[in-house]
């Protein structure tokens, strides 16, 4: 006959604790199995560009297998089903949108197979005629390092809402003074990232030739037709002084030799006042090239020194509605485009706020730039 010793209080406590932990583990396992059935999309709207074959993508996150259905027409979609985790879905435009406004093509309904959870994505297409087209024109090569920084700033600002249904063109001379290239900065909705695409090359281009500038400005309308236009000119500037005058005037002669008073002092910081000697264009010639276009610009912005003066503004009085310019020097870095771009394309690119553009410039040089040198003005040309 076996004799069982009575359990000590310590053994009983250990056994009860073990049983409690086991029960909690089982309960936690049951709770994990009862994970809420969920499905979600990375965005509520997939916006296709205006051309047939353009694509946009979004990510589906689900707790289990799912399928999708579509309503509407004018687009294809793949894949039409997925599993637990993340799945990239691509929408492709079957046709172009030749109109002047964004159109809704249809809706994608995503349904979880178990549990019935749902979400939806609207499929839209931008118009062939943009709400507005901005040209960032940066002639010359003396400021090329800063031009590339400016382009990087533009691309950092570009997203699904900037420029929205607007367009951004960039023309500059990365290779030689006799050449130029026209690019577009846009949001690649398929890769969900900013992109920079070459639209046209100019093998015989002279920034000082009004005819070349006039042809380039005409290409803006051909490449990116829009309801409204704006032009930014980033370069060196010397106010109303004629292009063929290196110095301020003949009355400013310091000796028998004409001293070029635009030459920077040794060790001076780079500004947008000096450089690219002999490659200038007169304001009157530039104004004539702008006026010769089939479109009128809503604004001209001079990312250059000394352009906010009554003489220059008078020459531009028939070219545009607003002029943003500096009455003094602008540092080589120029405008903070990453901060300013969203104000050029407010409300999905339908509108702009030029006052906020000026504030972005002032706040940058006042609070964040290494040099506190920033003065900017907004001129209303009708006044």
Sequence positions of predicted segments:
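Sec-dependent bacterial lipoprotein signal peptides
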Residues: 1-28
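Bacterial Sec-dependent N-terminal signal peptides
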Residues: 2-3, 24-47, 115-128
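Surface-exposed binding patches on compact interaction domains or structured appendages
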Residues: 38-41, 62-90
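A short beta-strand micro-motif common to beta-rich folds, especially ectodomain repeats
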Residues: 89, 101-116
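N-terminal extension/subdomain marker
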Residues: 127-227
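Solvent-exposed loop/turn segments at secondary-structure junctions
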Residues: 140-143, 174-178, 204-205, 235-241, ...
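Surface-exposed loop and adjacent secondary-structure segments within mature catalytic domains
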Residues: 173-198, 228, 232-277
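Terminal, contiguous helix-loop blocks that mediate binding/assembly
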Residues: 246-249, 255-383
């Amino acid at each position: 006959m076996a004799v069982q010793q009575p359990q000590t209080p310590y053994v009983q406590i250990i056994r009860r604790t073990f049983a409690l932990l086991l029960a909690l583990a089982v309960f936690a396992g049951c709770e994990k199995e009862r994970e809420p059935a969920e499905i979600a999309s990375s965005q509520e709207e997939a916006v296709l560009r205006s051309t047939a074959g353009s694509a946009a993508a979004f990510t589906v996150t689900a707790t289990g297998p799912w399928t999708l259905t579509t309503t509407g027409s004018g687009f294809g979609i793949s894949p039409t089903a997925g599993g637990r985790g993340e799945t990239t879905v691509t929408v492709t435009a079957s046709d172009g949108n030749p109109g002047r406004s964004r159109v809704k093509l249809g809706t994608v309904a995503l349904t979880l197979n178990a549990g019935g959870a749902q979400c939806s994505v609207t499929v839209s297409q931008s118009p062939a005629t943009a709400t507005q087209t901005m040209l960032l024109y940066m002639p010359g090569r003396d400021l090329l390092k800063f031009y590339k920084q400016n382009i990087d700033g533009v691309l950092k600002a570009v997203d699904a809402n900037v420029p929205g249904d607007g367009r951004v063109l960039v023309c500059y001379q990365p290779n030689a003074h006799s050449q130029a290239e026209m690019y577009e900065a846009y949001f690649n909705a398929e890769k969900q990232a900013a992109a920079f695409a070459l639209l046209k090359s100019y093998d015989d281009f002279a920034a000082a030739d009004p005819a070349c500038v006039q042809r380039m400005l005409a290409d803006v309308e051909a490449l990116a037709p829009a309801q409204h236009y704006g032009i930014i000119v980033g370069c060196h500037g010397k106010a109303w002084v004629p292009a063929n005058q290196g110095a301020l005037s003949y009355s400013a002669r310091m000796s028998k030799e004409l001293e070029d008073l635009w030459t920077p002092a040794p060790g001076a910081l780079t500004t947008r006042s000096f450089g690219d000697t002999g490659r200038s264009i007169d304001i009157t010639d530039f104004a004539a090239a702008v006026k010769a276009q089939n479109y009128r610009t809503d604004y001209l912005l001079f990312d250059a020194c000394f352009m906010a003066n009554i003489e220059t503004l008078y020459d531009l009085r028939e070219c545009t509605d607003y002029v943003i310019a500096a009455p003094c020097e602008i540092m080589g870095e120029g405008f903070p485009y990453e901060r300013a771009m969203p104000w050029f394309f407010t409300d999905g690119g339908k509108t702009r706020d030029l006052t906020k553009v000026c504030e972005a410039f002032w706040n940058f040089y006042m609070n964040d730039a290494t040099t506190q040198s920033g003065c900017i003005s907004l001129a209303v040309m009708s006044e």
